[in-house]
Amino acid sequence: MNILFLHHSTGECVWKGGVPEWFAAYNARHQTDYRITESIFPKKRPYGWKNYPYDYWNIWVKNAGPTPFLEEPTLEILTRQYDVIVFKHCFPVSEILPDTGVPDISSKDKRIENYKLQYAALRERLHSFTDTRFIVWTGAALTEGSTSPDSARRAADFFKWVRDVWDEPGDNIFTWDFFDLETEGSPYMKDGHAAGPYDSHPSPAFSRQVAPLFCQRIVDVIEGRGDVDRLPQAPSEEVSHHFGS
């Protein structure tokens, strides 16, 4: 079972929180062969350091096909190599502007009206790869010192929609509610989970707390529990007791 985790810096923090070690321990205990690897997507050059809804739509839907787009792999390429593909957005995704009333799927503007069109097209595209399971993180949140109340509320509303509406049971798409873990039900990333009041990267301690939950979510999806255990547990202070659980 080959698993790919596509990420930028927030995902790297969680990866370094113990993801490879968790899977090594799980495989040893359960005699499974779940092989996970990670990759920056998209890269800084030539595409650019942008992994927002527009960018997944741009690479995987608009420019779909058997060849890379600006050196980035399309779904046609990735699904030949991986059984499970996990992808996410970094925290600037939560810098959401007000809607204009004129949604545009090809717009880079961070607005709910555009995000929903891009997500709808992505869902249709992901559904076409029936032999691959996809796990989408709800977006990384911003600290209160890094955003406005209105923007934070729009982010909370959008990712609730992703979890409760966009993610349909019974298909090959699943979510992991990272936004909820970071915010604990508020619209802001908790300062205690962040690298700093104005730095919305997860702290090393928080990354170690949530890494086992991320790993367990992947295993639940692989083993057929993806629609049963949809909501993450609260972060644990200890990582080791999750290994092999």
For every predicted segment, state its role:
Residues 1-2, 29-35, 80-86, 127-135, ...:
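Loop/turn elements at helix/coil->beta-strand transitions in domains of secreted/extracellular proteins
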Residues 6-9, 37-43, 87-92, 137-141, ...:
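Active-site-proximal beta-strand/loop segments in catalytic clefts of secreted hydrolases
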Residues 26-64:
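A short beta-strand-loop structural module common to alpha/beta enzyme folds
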Residues 59-112, 139-144:
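Oxyanion-hole/transition-state-stabilizing segment in secreted/luminal serine hydrolases
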Residues 91, 123-157:
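Active-site segments of SGNH/GDSL-like serine hydrolases
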